[in-house]
Amino acid sequence: MRMIIVSGRSGSGKSTALDVLEDNGFYCVDNLPAGLLPELAERALINTELAEPLLAVSIDARNLPSHLTRFPQMLDEVRSRNIQCDVLYLDADEATLLKRFSETRRRHPLSTADRSLAEAIRDETTLLGPIIDLADLKINTTHLNLYQLRDALKLRLLNKPEPGTAFLIESFGFKRGMPVDADLVFDVRCLPNPYWKPELRDHSGLEQPVIDYLSVQPDVEEMFQDIFAYLNKWLPRFAASNRSYVTIAIGCTGGHHRSVYLTERLGQVLQQSLKNVQVRHRDLS
């Protein structure tokens, strides 16, 4: 049986996550009291109507504070039943959450006449502390639109063919912000930039003209070898420490050329020695 617990601050994308999971065969329960988590898992295990039990629940700040405090104990109880249980935590920066609430005009679950929206958002972080500390996967949705979030959720949650550590190698552009959910970040802005070649500017690191240009640059090859040597040595140690997810981010200025090229190459070579290696290009449209 597989269970995914979805949590996060209000406005971060929890409803979208449940929709994606439901569309892919998960039985979903929204706003489950954390104290009922073990009982729900037990009932799902003995339910003969579920050919392959796939269960997703959202637990967030709408819970009683006392239930959230007990979340670590509830999670241990579920996992003691030999259930593969992953905790997904979604978040976004405060300015983005404020903007989303302003656009939808929805009321924050913690807001009151005496508590501003900004205060409610900050208080929510404190309440969810026990879940944040135990999250297996954290996804920051600040720079993701609805479709990008759905794609990211499918990639990280549904393309994990077997238990073990799932590695995501992600290209990005610093001009749109660094991925705050990355575990390792490599800055490759010091490398020759195809953007300044007019004939290459409109191509990406996935296309042959850019590949041909970067593949003959000595600094690019040296950077690739150094990053690969580091990852090849240390990623197995991450896997041995029972990490469920590890995100490696490779960043250049715009996220179209150098980081894309290196991310693709690293993904190809690491897939030969590691299981569950995924590649994503955040800023390629």
UniProtKB/Swiss-Prot annotation:
MF annotations from Gene Ontology: ATP binding; GTP binding
Binding site for GTP: D60, A61, R62, N63
Domain of life: Bacteria
Positions bound to ATP: G8, R9, S10, G11, S12, G13, K14, S15
Family: Belongs to the RapZ-like family.
Job of this protein: Displays ATPase and GTPase activities.
Identification of the protein by name: Nucleotide-binding protein PSPPH_4154
Native organism: Pseudomonas savastanoi pv. phaseolicola (strain 1448A / Race 6) (Pseudomonas syringae pv. phaseolicola (strain 1448A / Race 6))
